[in-house]
Regions:
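Extended alpha-helical oligomerization segments
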Residues: 169-173
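Domain-core detector
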Residues: 1-165, 175-277
Length: 277
């Protein structure tokens, strides 16, 4: 996937990206969970032309299917002002890929949800199947959830609709009742129990109860959050708190390689029968 553009439902993904307000920040969690559906930010980048330059490169990626390599070239004029090059080539490559994949995968997920959760569509395609990305170094829980089939309105999706963390390429496949029978099921599965673990950020002091298998701050449904934000257009844009900056990782962990995932084909309700002439 590193050399390929993420496959996106263009109209919905573009709308998702365009609907955000640019917000300067020092840390990723300055904006928390569903706040990312309203605020565009890049950790450590303050509001201004540099942030807008990164945003423009990402918007181009959503609009035209820019690959990661092309996105890197688009960011080259900004690298010195971003300050990433000072931390080494590995850090620069890691941050660039992280920004690219995090933003575009979230846009893809929100757009896919918009298609799949349409009231007319869920009448025909009521089941959703969790699909693992096929990463070479998978998270055990994500691999265990692969193939799990639940109704579209199961509460489990409130916290577990992917992506579920940094570098997560998992996705959701819509299924009709006929599709369900084709994979040997006569109904949806039972949702796994949600086990939570305590978490505390050592810098900000923020605490949370995080579902096992999900990274802190990722236990929300980006598609539903996007819908909620549109239903409340006057809700305030999240403002980053005055927290100290996070320490720069000395050896950022490599993201797992992700294969390109095809976008589910848009489901179109059949035309009603025409009366005889």
């Amino acid at each position: 996937m590193t050399a390929e553009a993420l496959s996106l439902p263009p109209r919905e993904a573009i709308r998702f990206m365009l609907g955000k307000v640019s917000v300067g920040s020092r840390r990723y969690d300055d904006v928390w969970k569903a706040g990312h559906t309203r605020a565009f930010m890049v950790a450590g980048v303050q509001a201004g032309d540099v942030l807008e330059g990164v945003r423009a490169a990402l918007q181009k990626a959503a609009d035209t299917g820019t690959t990661l390599a092309e996105f890197k070239r688009d960011l080259n004029p900004l690298m010195e002002r971003l300050g990433w090059q000072d931390k080494g080539r590995r850090y620069t490559a890691w941050r660039t890929r992280l920004v690219y994949e995090t933003n575009l995968r979230s846009a893809y997920a929100a757009g896919a949800y918009e298609q799949m959760a349409d009231p007319d569509v869920v009448q025909l395609v009521p089941f959703w199947r969790y699909r693992h990305s096929g990463a070479k170094d998978p998270r055990p829980q994500h691999r265990a959830w692969d193939g799990l089939v639940l109704r579209h309105d199961d509460a489990w999706w409130t916290t577990h609709y992917p992506p579920n963390g940094w570098g997560c390429g998992c996705w959701v496949e819509p299924l009709t009742p006929t599709d369900l029978a084709g994979i040997g099921k006569d109904g949806p599965d039972q949702a796994p129990p949600i086990v939570r673990r305590p978490w505390r950020d050592p810098v900000s002091g923020r605490t949370d109860q995080v579902p096992v298998g999900i990274d802190p701050g990722w236990d929300y449904n980006v598609g539903q959050a996007w819908r909620d934000a549109r239903d409340l257009p006057d809700s305030p844009v999240p403002v980053p708190p005055d927290w100290p900056p996070a320490p720069t990782p000395s050896a950022p962990p490599p993201l797992p390689a992700q294969p390109r995932q095809p976008a589910p084909a848009p489901v179109v309700a059949p035309e009603p029968p025409q009366p005889p002439q």
